[in-house]
Design a protein with these regions (language model features):
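GIY-YIG nuclease catalytic motif and its immediate N-terminal context
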Residues: 1-30
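Short acidic, gly/pro-rich beta-turn/loop elements at beta-sheet edges
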Residues: 18-20, 45, 58-59, 102
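Residue-level detector of flexible, active-site-proximal loop/helix-junction positions
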Residues: 14, 55, 99
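Sequence-level motif detector for i,i+2 pairs with an aromatic at +2
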Residues: 3-5, 43, 84
Length: 178
């Protein structure tokens, strides 16, 4: 089971099943993703935030935005396990558990974000971006169509639930006949 504030590696199959030009590349299952939250209304849907080590590129974007007097809720730079990383909140996407390849580990230890202030800051930014996405607001020209992916994931969850119920019914019918 996924745990909030841990980092995970996404299976490449996700990017095959949901091809979107603007989804961040998975770097051969080496890009860590931060598990931000589980959807309250759809507990099978999890939202993850890709990370990047391209600090200068994103620091420049943040500085330009802040120079205009605006805050930057789409990106967040912080230290993760002794290394600066960028949380690409603008590129967060929904996922289901079967597409999680494994926990992201350092020296065999699963990486977890522990600093409560960092968790609150990221959560606040994630909530803002999620609310924009839910309302269908396009805020980036290179924004992946994550709501289309979410809808497809919800359809797949519904199909799996129906198939599971049919299996249960078939099993109980077989046991009744015995």
């Amino acid at each position: 089971m996924l745990q909030e504030h841990y980092f995970y590696i996404i299976d490449d199959q996700y990017f095959i099943d949901f091809p979107d030009t603007y989804l961040r590349g998975n770097h051969q299952e080496n890009r860590p993703h931060y598990f931000a939250f589980q959807e309250p209304s759809n507990p099978g849907i999890f939202w993850v935030v890709p990370l990047s080590s391209r600090i200068q590129k994103y620091r420049s974007i943040i500085q330009k935005k802040e120079a205009t007097g605006k805050s930057c809720d789409t990106l967040h730079i912080m230290d993760v396990a002794g290394k600066e990383e960028v949380f690409l909140i603008q590129d967060m996407f929904p996922i289901v558990e079967r597409y999680i390849k494994r926990e992201y580990t350092i020296s065999g230890i699963p990486l977890k974000l522990l600093n409560e202030n960092d968790i609150k800051t990221i959560r606040k930014k994630v909530n803002k971006v999620y609310n924009l996405l839910i309302r269908g607001i396009k805020f980036m020209p290179t924004q992946p169509n994550v709501m289309k992916i979410r809808d497809e994931l919800l359809k797949r969850i519904a199909v799996e639930e129906v198939l599971s119920l049919k299996e249960i019914a078939a099993t109980s019918d077989n046991q009744s006949e015995s």
